[in-house]
C-alpha cells in the first residue's frame, strides 16, 4: 500500500539520482495575511541549510493565499524545523509546518487520514497532535477554525502509515475528552460518502393535531412496512405537541413513507414528513442555509447599493428615499452624519435589484437636487477602490515605461505625469532648449511669441518651493518679470492664441470655471482640470503631486468638478492614491524625476493640440 512516507522517500530518491543536491521542502500553512516572504524567511533563518522560501499569492490581486514553502538542503534541518516551528506563532497566528508532498496521488488518496469530530473548543492543533502522536508518525494535524480563530469542533490527523490510523480509530473513538464524547473515524471524501438519505430509517413528522393518537399514526404508516417504534411528543396534559417520530425496520420503507405522506392532509393539517436529524446536524444544516442565503444577499446588495454624494445638508433620509424611489423598490437608505447629527453630504441607497440600481445611476447622476448636482455611482468598498486604482496605476506605469523606452528621444523631457492617457490629446516631448547655462526661452512661428521665464542657477525660488529638482548638480528656479531674450533657442509648437497668451504668473485666468470653456476641446478641459487640481494636491502631498493628479484625472469629469468644490472629498481621494503608490512595487523616483518636476513647475499651464 502506498503511503505518504513512501512518497517522500521516493521524491528523495529521484532527487539523489540527479546531479543537483538533495533538497527537502516543507509546506507552511495557516499563515497570517500580513506575513511576507521576508518574514517567512526570517522565521526559518535559524536553520543553516535553508535555501529559499516562497509565499503563494493570488495571480490577479497579488494577495497572500496564507500558505507557502520553505526549502532546505538538509533533510535533518527540515525535520528540526517541523519539530520547532509546527504550531508556533507567527505574526500572532499559529502556523502549521509539514512535509510538502508534490505527488498528487499521495496527497489525495486518503491513506492514513483520520477524521475527528465533536471536539471541545479547548482542543488546538498542538493538543490534537499530542492525543494521536503515540500511535505513529503524524504527517499533518489540523483543527478546523472559524475566521475569528475559534474551533469548529472537528479536525483531521494524517499518519504516515495506515496501521497507525486504524490503531488510533480503535482506541480513541467514543472516548471522553473534556466531558465530550469524540468521534474518530476514517476520513472519506465527499464524493465517497454515503448520503444520509440513502440509509435512514427514522422519520420526523410535524403539523399533527393535538388529539392525534399513536394508533392513528401507526395505522397511517403501517402500509409502508414494518414499524420498529413510534413516539408522539406530548405536553403536561398528555396532548400531542404537534410532532412525532416513526422508526422503520427497512430504509427503503422509510424513504417511500416520506415521499408518499409528506404534504398530504392528515386530520385538519398538511403533514411534513422527513428524515429525522440530530440536533447538531440540524444546526449545521441551518448554518449552511443561513450562510448561503447571506452570501446571496451580500452579492445582490454589492451591485444593488449606490453611493450618492454632493447631497444638500438640508436633505433628509426620507426625501432622499422618495427622490430615488422613482427607479424601483428601495430596501434601505442611509445618510451619513457627524457626531452632532449634521449631514455629511453623502449617503447610500440600496435597491432590491441590480437593474434598479443601474437605472438610478443613469437617471440621477449629475441631476440637480436641492440646488446641487448629485454624484451617483455603484457603491464600492475601500479595498475594491484601492485595488482598482492599483490596477490602473500599474497599467499606466507599464505603458509609460514601454512608450518612453521606445519613442522618447534622447535629450527630451517626458510629458507631465498627469497628461498621459486622456483621449483626444496628443502629447509630445519637450526638447532641451539650453542656449547658455542660465537662460531658456521659446518662440512660435506664425503666431504670437510666448515668453517663458528664464531659469537661473542658484537663484531663490519665489513661485514654488521644493518643486525643482537638481540639474547639473545646481539648483534652478524661475526669475519673474523677465522679457523675451535674444539668447534663447526657438521651440516650435502649434498652440492656440488663447493658450499663447497664458503665462505662469496669471493664476486668476487658470481658475476660470469649466462652464466658461465649454467651447474648448475635451483635451483642453482635462488639461485645465489638471491645472486646477495640481496646486490643491500639492498642498496635501508635495512630493507626489504629479502622480496623484494623474491618477485623479482618470475619474469622471463631473466627479472632478465636485472634488474641486469639496476639500474633504479631495483629501480622501488623495489619501487613497497615496496608499496605492505606497503599496505598489513601482520605483517612484525614476532617474528623470527632475524633468517631470521642471515640467510641473514650468509648463503646467500649456496645453498641446
From Swiss-Prot:
For this protein, the record's SMART domains field holds: PolyA, RRM, RRM_1
Keywords of this entry: Cytoplasm, Nucleus, Repeat, RNA-binding, Translation regulation
A GO molecular function assigned to this protein is:
RNA binding
Q: Name the domain of life this protein comes from.
A: Eukaryota
Q: Which GO terms describe its cellular component?
A: cytoplasm; nucleus
- Tissue-specificity statement: Expressed predominantly in siliques.
**A Gene Ontology BP annotation from the UniProt entry:** regulation of translation
Q: State where the protein is found.
A: Cytoplasm; Nucleus
Where's it mainly located?
cytoplasm
Q: Which residues form the RRM domain?
A: 24-102, 112-189, 201-278, 304-381
Residue span(s) of domain PABC: 509-586
Instruction: State the family named in the UniProt similarity comment for this chain.
Output: Belongs to the polyadenylate-binding protein type-1 family.
Instruction: State what this protein does.
Output: Binds the poly(A) tail of mRNA. Appears to be an important mediator of the multiple roles of the poly(A) tail in mRNA biogenesis, stability and translation.
Query: What protein name applies here?
Result: Polyadenylate-binding protein 7
Biological source species? Arabidopsis thaliana (Mouse-ear cress)
Identify the gene encoding this protein. Answer: PAB7
